[in-house]
């Protein structure tokens, strides 16, 4: 029987209630060999006789550690044992930062999914990951969006969705699951490098808070981020609805006289949508604040934003020309 543990039941209940993984879906599963991804793949394998998914694994080797090839060999052995097809990608040498590597991983996932007709890209993010992200963003300084939980599912491209079916799982649960089923966890030594902010948070700060302040810290953080997500989703939808009412029909412009009447929270979100949609530019909070102050002063003038001239007349705030710099 495929529901032979409480985590099997939890996983089955989650994907059914949220309709995350319909029967016969084509799944591309990011597989690192760590305990979270091992748990996800094992659960998919056990439930597959019921759902009949087409499951394929993908592994990214960043070659940042001397033992990364050994980790990859273990991933290959696991995939072979469970008879899963596996894609293997080595990170290019020039991608030497976490952010650049992250963009490369997501680009590769999307391209591969589109070319091979995968409808779901699965990531083994857990509630523990979500709580660590919340704390990390809080310490670094963030907006309300930075406190919101990552979504269960979101659309990346036409007919391709990214799905995180373990978002209500905790790391102690995936650790127990791997021990129960003798799954070969590959221990990433870099997770214990305290030079990295997130590792110190995970290994030192979180255990300290759980010991002396809040033993259910991860659950509390997950609950908070989930509640914040409801509010931010509503604000985003409301901002998008108003954005389409206020934009010019022909020009890259927005009605600033009507915009000024809105709450500052909605104004900032509308401007963010405006810049991303028209200029492919994601402004930071300081830049958005500068624009809001500019239109509030109601001076018929212009400002420079990311090498674009932004102009304001009696009614419209619009994009003028792009500044081209010659070296």
Curated annotation (Swiss-Prot):
GO terms for biological process: tRNA modification. ATP binds at residues 32-37. It is an enzyme of class 6 (ligase). GO terms for molecular function: ATP binding; tRNA(Ile)-lysidine synthase activity. Pfam families: ATP_bind_3. Keywords: ATP-binding, Chloroplast, Ligase, Nucleotide-binding, Plastid, tRNA processing. It catalyses: cytidine(34) in tRNA(Ile2) + L-lysine + ATP = lysidine(34) in tRNA(Ile2) + AMP + diphosphate + H(+). Its EC number is 6.3.4.19. PANTHER family: TRNA(ILE)-LYSIDINE SYNTHASE-RELATED. The N-terminal region contains the highly conserved SGGXDS motif, predicted to be a P-loop motif involved in ATP binding. This is tRNA(Ile)-lysidine synthase, chloroplastic. It comes from Porphyra purpurea (Red seaweed).
């Amino acid at each position: 029987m495929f529901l032979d543990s409480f985590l099997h039941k939890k996983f089955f209940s989650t994907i059914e209630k949220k309709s995350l993984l319909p029967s016969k879906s084509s799944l591309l599963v990011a597989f690192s060999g760590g305990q979270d991804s091992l748990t996800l793949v094992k659960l998919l394998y056990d439930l597959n006789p019921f759902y009949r998914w087409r499951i394929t694994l993908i592994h990214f080797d960043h070659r940042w550690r001397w033992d990364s090839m050994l980790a990859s060999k273990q991933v290959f052995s696991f995939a072979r044992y469970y008879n899963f097809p596996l894609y293997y990608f080595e990170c290019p040498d020039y991608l030497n930062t976490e952010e650049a590597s992250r963009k490369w991983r997501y680009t590769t996932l999307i391209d591969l999914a589109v070319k091979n007709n995968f409808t779901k890209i699965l990531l083994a993010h857990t509630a523990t990951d979500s709580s660590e992200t919340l704390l990390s963003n809080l310490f670094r300084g963030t907006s309300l969006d930075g406190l919101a939980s990552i979504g269960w599912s979101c659309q990346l491209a036409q007919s391709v969705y990214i799905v995180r079916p373990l978002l209500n799982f905790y790391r102690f649960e995936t650790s127990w699951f791997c021990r129960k089923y003798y799954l070969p966890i590959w221990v990433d030594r870099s997770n214990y490098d305290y030079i990295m902010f997130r590792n110190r948070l995970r290994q030192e700060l979180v255990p300290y808070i759980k010991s002396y302040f809040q033993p259910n810290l991860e659950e509390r953080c997950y609950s908070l981020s989930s509640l914040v997500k409801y509010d931010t989703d509503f604000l985003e939808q409301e901002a998008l609805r108003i954005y389409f009412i206020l934009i010019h029909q022909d020009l890259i412009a927005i009605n600033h006289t009507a915009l000024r009447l809105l709450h500052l929270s909605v104004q900032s979100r509308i401007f963010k949508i405006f810049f991303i949609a028209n200029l492919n530019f994601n402004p930071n909070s300081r830049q958005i604040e500068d624009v809001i102050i500019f239109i509030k002063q109601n001076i018929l003038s212009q400002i420079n934003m990311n090498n674009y001239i932004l102009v304001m007349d009696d009614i419209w705030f619009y994009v003028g020309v792009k500044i081209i710099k010659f070296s």
